[in-house]
């Protein structure tokens, strides 16, 4: 049986308004604040800021 672990699945959603998103995991103990990272948005065809949203 697997242990519970300290990583949560999160959704990184584009701030360009295209609706594109990435899914990833983050360690909730070492990084309790919301994550914001610059990634490539293929719909906007440029690098934009992605912000953490709740994964439904």
Curated annotation (Swiss-Prot):
Transmembrane segments: none annotated. Disulfide bonds: none annotated. GO terms for molecular function: structural constituent of ribosome. Pfam families: Ribosomal_L33. Residues 15-25 have a biased composition (Polar residues). InterPro entries: Ribosomal_bL33 (IPR001705), Ribosomal_bL33_sf (IPR038584), Ribosomal_zn-bd (IPR011332). Residues 1-29 are annotated as: Disordered. Keywords: Ribonucleoprotein, Ribosomal protein. One of its GO terms (cellular component) is cytosolic large ribosomal subunit. It comes from the Bacteria. Belongs to the bacterial ribosomal protein bL33 family. This is Large ribosomal subunit protein bL33. It comes from Verminephrobacter eiseniae (strain EF01-2).
């Amino acid at each position: 049986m697997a242990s519970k672990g300290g990583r949560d699945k999160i959704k990184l959603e584009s701030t360009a308004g295209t609706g594109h998103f990435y899914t990833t995991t983050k360690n909730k103990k070492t990084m309790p604040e919301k994550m914001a990272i610059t990634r490539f948005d293929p719909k906007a065809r440029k690098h934009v800021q992605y912000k953490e949203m709740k994964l439904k």
